[in-house]
Amino acid sequence: MLKYKKIVLADDDADDRQIFEEILREIDPEAEVVNAENGLEMVALLDKMPDDQLPDIIILDQNMPKMTGKESLIFLKESPRYCNISTIVYSTYQVQDFYQECLELGAQDVVAKPDTMQAYREMIEQFLVAH
């Protein structure tokens, strides 16, 4: 069972979005996933949501066109409307400074972007499943 029921996933890779959603639905079929292809699309989706329908958590891929994960994180944490939404950034970057900077900007966590189905499952179980 998920501790977060409504999730926004911003990732420009359609295959990664599909894998994430498939695994999430296996774990909790009632979970709602809203997908965005980049940070700008995520902002547009959030802006259309009523306050009582905002997501419980936002997961951001760092390497997106138009608005990166870090740029999206800065926007979210500077916005009074969105600053309290839990946010995770994932990235293929393996640079400690990047991880630390995102944490200082307000990310709940920063993780290596999953590269296998099992790695996606482990990430979802670590961050989204109620223990």
Labelled PLM ranges:
Residues D52-L60:
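Active-site beta3 strand of CheY-like receiver
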Residues N35-D47, G69:
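Helix N-cap/capping motif at the beta->alpha junctions
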Residues E71, Q94-V111:
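Alpha4 helix (beta4-alpha4-beta5 surface) of REC/receiver domains from two-component response regulators
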Residues A44, K70-C83:
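Short amphipathic alpha-helix used as the core "switch/output" element in two-component signaling
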Residues A14-N38, L105:
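Two-component/phosphorelay signaling modules centered on CheY-like receiver
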Residues D11, L60-D61:
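Active-site residues of response regulator receiver
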Residues M64:
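Receiver (REC) domain active-site loop signature in two-component systems and cognate sites
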